[in-house]
From Swiss-Prot:
It comes from Chlamydomonas reinhardtii. Associates with the spoke-associated complex containing CFAP61, CFAP91 and CFAP251; the association is calcium sensitive. The keyword Metal-binding applies. Ca(2+) 3 binds at D97, D99, N101, E108. This protein has four functional calcium-binding sites. InterPro entries: CALM/Myosin/TropC-like, EF-hand-dom_pair, EF_Hand_1_Ca_BS, EF_hand_dom. This is Calmodulin. It holds the Pfam family EF-hand_7. SUPFAM superfamilies: EF-hand.
Length: 163
């Protein structure tokens, strides 16, 4: 597990130490789980509440609700790896979002899939949009796109009673 932190540069470690110290209000060498979200956001990350809970349970070995600096470093090393993946997803989203309005319409999805050699029927494209479109606005925003790409939402057709 510690091998993750070996890929961090001294500069990154110093930056994380600074951020950590900023939120270690009482200077006892630990930050509370509530403060973790604030620390992550200050470093350009944008974790959801669920992601924060997952991260905390991954590194809070003794379950005391606080994270010490070595645990924090491991966490940040892990998040840096995920950020690379996130950059790739953002680039992919831009490919689909032809007009750059922050949403993927059925027409945009159909256009890109066709160019990729995927000949999809109207129904298949509409189905992909429906499954990814969590807020029901008929388009796919970035969060929905990420969820679709990381959870394989389009593979769940059979589970939703589609026969």
């Amino acid at each position: 597990m510690a091998a993750n932190t070996e890929q961090l540069t001294e500069e990154q470690i110093a930056e994380f130490k600074e951020a950590f110290a900023l939120f270690d209000k009482d200077g006892d060498g630990t930050i509370t789980t509530k403060e973790l979200g604030t620390v992550m956001r200050s470093l350009g990350q944008n974790p959801t509440e669920a992601e924060l809970q997952d991260m905390i349970s991954e590194v809070d070995a003794d379950g005391n609700g606080t994270i010490d600096f070595p645990e924090f470093l491991m966490l940040m090393a892990r998040k840096m790896k995920e950020t690379d993946h996130e950059d790739e997803l953002r680039e992919a989203f831009k490919v689909f979002d032809k007009d750059g309005n922050g949403f993927i319409s059925a027409a945009e999805l159909r256009h890109v899939m066709t160019n990729l050699g995927e000949k999809l029927s109207e129904e298949e494209v509409d189905e992909m949009i429906r499954e990814a479109d969590v807020d029901g606005d008929g388009q796919v925003n970035y969060e929905e796109f990420v969820r679709m790409m990381t959870s394989g939402a389009t593979d769940d057709k059979d589970k939703k009673g589609h026969k």
